[in-house]
UniProtKB/Swiss-Prot annotation:
Subunit: Component of the large ribosomal subunit.
Protein's UniProt name: Large ribosomal subunit protein uL1
Record PROSITE patterns: RIBOSOMAL_L1
Locations listed in the record: Cytoplasm
PTM-bearing positions, type Phosphotyrosine: Y11
Species this chain originates from: Sus scrofa
One Pfam family per UniProt: Ribosomal_L1
Amino acid sequence: MSSKVSRDTLYEAVREVLHGNQRNXXKFLETVELQISLKNYDPQKDKRFSGTVRLKSTPRPKFSVCXLGDQQHCDEAKAVDIPHMDIEALKKLNKNKKLVKKLAKKYDAFLASESLIKQIPRILGPGLNKAGKFPSLLTHNXDMVAKVDEVKSRVKFQMKEVLCL
C-alpha cells in the first residue's frame, strides 16, 4: 500500500461512514476518530503538537458558550439570548473550587472581553484552565454571534503517542 492516501479516497471513506450512520438510525450521537500515522516524524526531537481547526459546518449544535464580559458585552449577549456573566457575578464565585468547577461543567466554552480576560485567573483561580476551557478573546469590534458560531465550529486536535499498531 502506498504511503499517501488520495483526497478522493479519503472523501469516499468519510461519505461511506456517514451513509452507514444514516442507514442504522441510532438514538445517540456517534463520534468518529481519525488516526493518521506520520512518516519520518521523531516525537522525541519534534515535540508533540496540538491546535484547533475551524470547520465549515458546526459539528456540535448543542455546544453551549458563555460570555464573560463587561457591561457592553453583557447587554449584547442578553439581546441575542447568549448566557453571560459580568465581573460582579464572577467575583461572587470567590475562587470557590466547587463553584468554578460547576461553572466549567455547565458550559462547553467561554468568551471573555479584552478588559476582563487578564483578570480571570485572579478572580476564578486555575479552575477553567484545568478544565481546558480558558476563555477565547472577545473584542468590541467583532460581532458576538459570529464569534460564538466560530467557537462552535472549532475542533481541537493533538498528537498522542500510539500505544500499539
